[in-house]
Structure formats: C-alpha cells, structure tokens
C-alpha cells in the first residue's frame, strides 16, 4: 500500500510539471482559426509527452486509508472513512440522510 501512495505522489508531481505545456498545446490544437499544419504539430507534441503527465493517470485515493475504491472527490476520503468521521462528529454540517 505504501508503494501506491509513493507512486501517486510521483504522478502528481509529473502532472503539475507538465500541466501548463499540455494546456498550451491543447489550446493550439483546438483553435480552428489556425492553419491545419500548426494544429497537427501541436497534436504531435502532445503525443510525444509521457502518458503519465496527464491527469487521467492519477488514481484518486483516500487521504486517510490510501484506499483506491469509492473515493468521494469533494472530501478526498473513501465512503467508509467518511462514514466513520461523520458518525463521530468530526465533519461539521454533514448529517445522515433519512427518508
């Protein structure tokens, strides 16, 4: 489990390092006012970038348990840990929903 946490941190660093460059190439590629050869060149540069530099490569993991399943994006916690924190009144403003 510790290996997955280290791997995820490494992927985050790679993503933030190449994020601006990837956005620049993508904006050039999607700009329809530019000639096609410039847009194709930008597409080639994006393909040359490492696939681990994209946001899709990063796995969402729980902040507390490092669990990779059922992680809620708003809290960055798995549903199990979030349920425990809510039941112990550690999270303000969140209540159990009853019909």
UniProtKB/Swiss-Prot annotation:
<keyword id="KW-0689">Ribosomal protein</keyword>
<dbReference type="GO" id="GO:0006412">
    <property type="term" value="P:translation"/>
</dbReference>
<keyword id="KW-0687">Ribonucleoprotein</keyword>
<dbReference type="GO" id="GO:0015935">
    <property type="term" value="C:small ribosomal subunit"/>
</dbReference>
<dbReference type="InterPro" id="IPR001209">
    <property type="entry name" value="Ribosomal_uS14"/>
</dbReference>
<dbReference type="InterPro" id="IPR018271">
    <property type="entry name" value="Ribosomal_uS14_CS"/>
</dbReference>
<comment type="similarity">
    <text>Belongs to the universal ribosomal protein uS14 family.</text>
</comment>
<dbReference type="GO" id="GO:0003735">
    <property type="term" value="F:structural constituent of ribosome"/>
</dbReference>
<protein>
    <recommendedName>
        <fullName>Small ribosomal subunit protein uS14m</fullName>
    </recommendedName>
</protein>
<dbReference type="GO" id="GO:0005739">
    <property type="term" value="C:mitochondrion"/>
</dbReference>
<dbReference type="Pfam" id="PF00253">
    <property type="entry name" value="Ribosomal_S14"/>
</dbReference>
<keyword id="KW-0496">Mitochondrion</keyword>
